[in-house]
Amino acid sequence: MDPPAGAAGRLLCPALLLLLLLPLPADARLAAAAADPPGGPQGHGAERILAVPVRTDAQGRLVSHVVSAATAPAGVRTRRAAPAQIPGLSGGSEEDPGGRLFYNVTVFGRDLHLRLRPNARLVAPGATVEWQGESGATRVEPLLGTCLYVGDVAGLAESSSVALSNCDGLAGLIRMEEEEFFIEPLEKGLAAKEAEQGRVHVVYHRPTTSRPPPLGGPQALDTGISADSLDSLSRALGVLEERVNSSRRRMRRHAADDDYNIEVLLGVDDSVVQFHGTEHVQKYLLTLMNIVNEIYHDESLGAHINVVLVRIILLSYGKSMSLIEIGNPSQSLENVCRWAYLQQKPDTDHDEYHDHAIFLTRQDFGPSGMQGYAPVTGMCHPVRSCTLNHEDGFSSAFVVAHETGHVLGMEHDGQGNRCGDEVRLGSIMAPLVQAAFHRFHWSRCSQQELSRYLHSYDCLRDDPFTHDWPALPQLPGLHYSMNEQCRFDFGLGYMMCTAFRTFDPCKQLWCSHPDNPYFCKTKKGPPLDGTMCAPGKHCFKGHCIWLTPDILKRDGNWGAWSPFGSCSRTCGTGVKFRTRQCDNPHPANGGRTCSGLAYDFQLCNSQDCPDALADFREEQCRQWDLYFEHGDAQHHWLPHEHRDAKERCHLYCESKETGEVVSMKRMVHDGTRCSYKDAFSLCVRGDCRKVGCDGVIGSSKQEDKCGVCGGDNSHCKVVKGTFSRSPKKLGYIKMFEIPAGARHLLIQEADTTSHHLAVKNLETGKFILNEENDVDPNSKTFIAMGVEWEYRDEDGRETLQTMGPLHGTITVLVIPEGDARISLTYKYMIHEDSLNVDDNNVLEDDSVGYEWALKKWSPCSKPCGGGSQFTKYGCRRRLDHKMVHRGFCDSVSKPKAIRRTCNPQECSQPVWVTGEWEPCSRSCGRTGMQVRSVRCVQPLHNNTTRSVHTKHCNDARPEGRRACNRELCPGRWRAGSWSQCSVTCGNGTQERPVLCRTADDSFGVCREERPETARICRLGPCPRNTSDPSKKSYVVQWLSRPDPNSPVQETSSKGRCQGDKSVFCRMEVLSRYCSIPGYNKLCCKSCNPHDNLTDVDDRAEPPSGKHNDIEELMPTLSVPTLVMEVQPPPGIPLEVPLNTSSTNATEDHPETNAVDVPYKIPGLEDEVQPPNLIPRRPSPYEKTRNQRIQELIDEMRKKEMLGKF
C-alpha cells in the first residue's frame, strides 16, 4: 500500500477492496466548545461567525426565537420550550399545514430566508433503533426522523439546497451557487433557554472556487505589474476549474422515472456512542445521513438515488471490540460484513430488511489516516453489500458517500478512466479526495460507471414508503405486447415497426405510426423480457428464444447430503462432517438462496485413547515448540483455557518459561474439549457444541459427583485424612498418594509453614507442581494430566485443588524449609468401585462436616442517598471453621440472604475533574494536539470520589483537547535545476526554484541563508547589422543608478498577508514562481508559510550607492500562461558599451540584459570606446532581440504616447 499523501489528500489503494484516506476536521462533537467549535469545515479559506437564527412565517415575519423541534427523537431527552409570544404579532403561523418550516438567519451581511420541508424519505416506515447492552439485552425503539428537513433559500430556488436538522438547534448545510455555509449550535442541550434570547450558532463560510475571487484592487495599480496581468493570471489558474464546472452544467440530469432506494442498516459501535454521548448520538446520526442523502441527490450523479434508513443498531463495548481488529482493515471489514449478514431479516418484505449496511467506528481499523474500506460492485449481495467507515464528524458524510459509491460500482477518478482533471475540484470518487462542504460533485466517470451497473441492482427497485404492490409476473413482457409497449413509449396509434424485417425485434424496439409506417423510431432499448417475438418464442436478455423454465426466476433448494467424511480423531471422541450444496436447483435469475447450514456433523471414535494421560489441546500447543517464537525466543508451550467462554475454541497456549499466554491465531482442532470443567462438550469449527454425558449432541444429561452419567451420588464415597511428618533430611519428603479416578480433590496445609507443596505423576515421574529446582510460590491456575488445577499460597499456607477426574495416580510431596512439623489434610470423592478396600479414611456421610457461614456483606448498591446490601455466604468446614470451596456445601441448603440499608447520607453534586495535559503529539507542524482526561465525579462521604455519567454534571464540560506546537518545523533549502538562459546571445540571466522543505516535504523554516535564485549567463555575441554600413550595433544596459534629475518613486510596500487568493497556490508545481512579486502577492501564504507578514515587492527598489557598484538583475519569467510587464524605473541611466569591432565580441561583458541599437549615435562612433559608460535615456525607437525586454520597451512607449494625449 502506498503511503499517505500530503495535506491535500490521502492515497487510496487501487485494489479490489478500496480504502479511503481523507483529511477531515479534527473533531465534530455536537457539544462544541465556544473557543473552537468543531465539526464544521475548517482549513484554508474557511471563515466563521456567530449568528442567532429565528423561526418565521412564510413571509419572513418573526414567529419565535425557538428554533429546535418541539419533540426530540425517541431515546433523546430534551425539555420542551414553549414558543415565545410576540406582542402585536399577527398573521403567519409557526408552520404551515404541510409541515413546512421557515427560518431567517443573517450570515456575513446577508439575510437568508430558509424554506424547509420535512425529509420524509430518509427514515422508512417501521424503522427502529436498537441499543445493545453488554449482557445481551436489547432495547428497541421506533426510529423517528421528525426533525430532519430539506429545502432551499428564498429567491434562489433553482441554485440552492438546504439540509438541516432542528432536533437541538439548527445543524446542517446551506449550499448556494456562489458559496456554502455550514451551521451548528455553539453549545448543545440548551433548547429550554431558546425562548428567552434565542440560540447562538456558529456559521462557517467558504466561497466556491468556480469563480476566482477578484485580485489586485487599488494597490495593484501601484505596482510594476498591471491589473490586466494579474487578471490574466487569475484566469489562467481558473481555466481547468471552469471547464469542469461547465461540463457539470452540461450533465445536469432530468428527473428519472425510476427512483432507486438504498435501504440502509446503520451499524454504530461503542466508540462513536461514547464520543457523542447517548443523549446526542441518535440525532447526530440522523443529521449525518441526511447530508449523505443530499450528496446522492446532487444533479451531477445523473440518477435519482434515495438513502433510506430502515434500522440503526448501536453496539455494546464488547461486541464493538470483537468486530474491529486494530490495524487490520481487511479482517475488520470481513467481521463487519459477516455481522451485517447475521442481522438481515429472512423476510424480504420485513420493514427492517436492508439492501446495504454502513458501519461507523472511531477505532483505528487500519493505518493512520485510513478512513474507509469497502468491496466493489457488491450492492444487493447478501455479504458484500457493506462498508466500513471511520467516523470523524459531519465531513464523514463524504467518506460514507465515497465508500457506498464503490459498492455501487464506481471507481476512483483518474484511475483507469479519463476524469483525473476533476480530482482537484472536489469529485467525490477522487483518489486524492478534495470533496468538502463547500464543493463536491460526482464526476462524469462516476455517472457513467453508475449507469453501467445501476439497472442490475434489483433490490433498489422497491420503495419502502409504499406497500401492497401487486405481485409482478416473473417476466413482465408476458403481459405486454410490442404494440402496447410502442404505445407506452410514443403515444396512441404507435405500433411495432413492420416496414423492415432485417432486424432482430429483441435487440431494439422499433415503432412507427400507421400514418407514416416507413418512419420508425426507437428509444434504443430492447422490449421487456417475456415479450412475444415469434410463434412460441419470447424476448429474453435481448434475444428471441424458446422460453424454457430454466431461465425464469428460480429459488434455490438443498441437494442431497454427501457421505460422512473421516473422523477428526482416532480416539477420545472426534467429529466427522457431511455437506450439501444449494443445487437442487441452483438459485437463478434473482431467486432466493437456500437457508440453513451447509454442513452437518456427528461424533465418532468415542473410545478412550490408550494413553490415558493424553491431552488433545496440550498436543496442539506442543506442536508449536519448534516453530512459534515469541519475544525473539523459543518456548515450551502448555495448554491454557481462556476465561471467556466464547474464546475457548481458539488455541491459546502458555509459556512454561515465562508464564505468558499467547493466542496462536487459529481454532483448535475439531473434537477438542471446550473446557476442562466439561468432559463432553466439543469444539466444532470454532464453536462449542453441547454434548451430554450420554454422547448425544445437545443433550443436557450430566455426571454426578463421582462420574456416573445421570447418577444420584449414591455410589460416591468421600475419602479424607490428615498426614503429618517431621523433616529429617534434605530433599523431597513423600506424604501420600491420590488414586486415579479421584474427583473434587482438596489438599491443604493444616498450619502456616515455610515448606513447599509438590506433586508428581506416579507413572511418568514428572513433576506437575514445584520441581525441586524450580519452585514457584505464586498462586496460579494450570493444566496438567488433562485436568485444571488451582494452586493458592496465602500467607504461607498452601492449597491445591481440582475438579478431576484424575487420569493417573499422583504422589504428594513436600520440600521442607526449616524444622517445623509438616501436616497435610486431603479430601476427595471417588466411585465405590474404584475405592481401595484397605483405605480406612472413607466417610459414609460427609454432608454434616460443612456448613454455610456468613462471609461478608455485599457492596452497597448506592454510594449515597440510601442503598441496600446483602449477606454473602461461604462454605465453612465445621472441624476447624476454615472457609473451603463452595462445592463442599452442595448438599447443604443455603440460607436466604439478609438485606439491610447502607450509606444513608445525602449525595453531593457531581463536578468536572480534569487531568494533566499530556505531552504534545508533535514538536512542530500543523497537526500537534494534546489531550487530557475529563471526568464527571461525585464526592463521597469517606473523602473518596466515584465517576458518574457526564449528564449529571451541570457546568460546561472543560476542554479535553487543544492544539499545540502549531509552528513550522525546521527545514533545509532545496534548490532545483537552473533554467535556460533568458537570451540567445549576449548576456542574460538564469533562475532556479529554491524552497525550504522539511523531511516530509512540507513547508518549513530555514535558518541558513537562502541560496541564490538567479545568476548571470553569458553566451556568444549577438550578430552585427551589416545591411547598412552607416548603422552600427551597440549594446545598452540598464543600471540601477539614482538620477538626481529624475527622482525614483517609492514603490516597495509591506502588507499583512490575507491568505492565498487562489486554490492553485497550494500546488507544489507552482511554488517556483514565488520569486515573482505578482505571484508572491497572489499566493502570499503558500509562498511565505513561516511568516504571516508577507513582503510584497512589486518592483525592485533601486539601491543607493556608487555607480560602479550597483547592478539590477531583471527576473526571468517562465510561467507559460503569464506575461509580466515591468516598466523600467524612470531616470535610470543606461550604460552603452559599443560593439564597434569584432575583436571585442568575446570579451567579458558585465551587463545582464543586452539590446541591439540599430541606429547610429552621433558623435560617439569615434570618440567612445568600450567599456565606457554613457548616461542616456532609452529611446522609444529602440529594438532588441531579447523578446522580454522588447515587450517592456513597447509598453513604456505606449504609456508615453497615452500621456501626451
Swiss-Prot record:
Domain of life: Eukaryota
Catalytic activity: Cleaves the N-propeptide of collagen chain alpha1(I) at Pro-|-Gln and of alpha1(II) and alpha2(I) at Ala-|-Gln
Active site, per annotation: 403
Cofactor, how bound (note): Binds 1 zinc ion per subunit.
Disintegrin domain span: 474-554
Region annotation Disordered: where it falls in the sequence: 1163-1184
SMART domains: TSP1
Glycosylated residue positions: 104, 245, 942-943, 987, 1025, 1092, 1139, 1144
GO process terms (BP): collagen biosynthetic process; collagen catabolic process; collagen fibril organization; extracellular matrix organization; protein processing; proteolysis; supramolecular fiber organization
Primary localization: secreted
UniProt-annotated binding residues for Zn(2+): 402, 406, 412
SUPFAM superfamilies linked: Metalloproteases ('zincins'), catalytic domain, TSP-1 type 1 repeat
GO cellular component: extracellular matrix; extracellular region
PROSITE patterns: ADAM_MEPRO, PLAC, TSP1
Associated disorder: Defects in ADAMTS2 are the cause of dermatosparaxis, a recessively inherited disorder characterized by severe skin fragility and biochemically by the presence in skin of procollagen incompletely processed at the N-terminus.
Name of this protein: A disintegrin and metalloproteinase with thrombospondin motifs 2
Gene this protein is translated from: ADAMTS2
